[in-house]
Swiss-Prot record:
<dbReference type="GO" id="GO:0031640">
    <property type="term" value="P:killing of cells of another organism"/>
</dbReference>
<keyword id="KW-0078">Bacteriocin</keyword>
<comment type="function">
    <text>Lanthionine-containing peptide antibiotic (lantibiotic) active on Gram-positive bacteria. The bactericidal activity of lantibiotics is based on depolarization of energized bacterial cytoplasmic membranes, initiated by the formation of aqueous transmembrane pores. Ruminococcin A is a broad spectrum bacteriocin exhibiting activity against a wide range of pathogenic clostridia and B.longum.</text>
</comment>
<feature type="cross-link" description="Lanthionine (Ser-Cys)">
    <location>
        <begin position="32"/>
        <end position="46"/>
    </location>
</feature>
<dbReference type="GO" id="GO:0050830">
    <property type="term" value="P:defense response to Gram-positive bacterium"/>
</dbReference>
<dbReference type="InterPro" id="IPR007682">
    <property type="entry name" value="Lantibiotic_typ-A_Lactobact"/>
</dbReference>
<keyword id="KW-0732">Signal</keyword>
<feature type="cross-link" description="Beta-methyllanthionine (Thr-Cys)">
    <location>
        <begin position="45"/>
        <end position="47"/>
    </location>
</feature>
<comment type="similarity">
    <text>Belongs to the type A lantibiotic family.</text>
</comment>
<dbReference type="Pfam" id="PF04604">
    <property type="entry name" value="L_biotic_typeA"/>
</dbReference>
<feature type="modified residue" description="2,3-didehydrobutyrine">
    <location>
        <position position="39"/>
    </location>
</feature>
<keyword id="KW-0964">Secreted</keyword>
<dbReference type="GO" id="GO:0005576">
    <property type="term" value="C:extracellular region"/>
</dbReference>
<feature type="signal peptide">
    <location>
        <begin position="1"/>
        <end position="23"/>
    </location>
</feature>
<keyword id="KW-0425">Lantibiotic</keyword>
<keyword id="KW-0883">Thioether bond</keyword>
<dbReference type="GO" id="GO:0005102">
    <property type="term" value="F:signaling receptor binding"/>
</dbReference>
Amino acid sequence: MRNDVLTLTNPMEENELEQILGGGNGVLKTISHECNMNTWQFLFTCC
């Protein structure tokens, strides 16, 4: 039963979580291009 629950919840691995949250190398990969997280943070906090 535990294996069924884990399959249903689809747990993330640590490297996947770091990539989504912008950890690790600080680059967020998107479909069209790669954006540096610092660029996004600047755009949302500059004003």
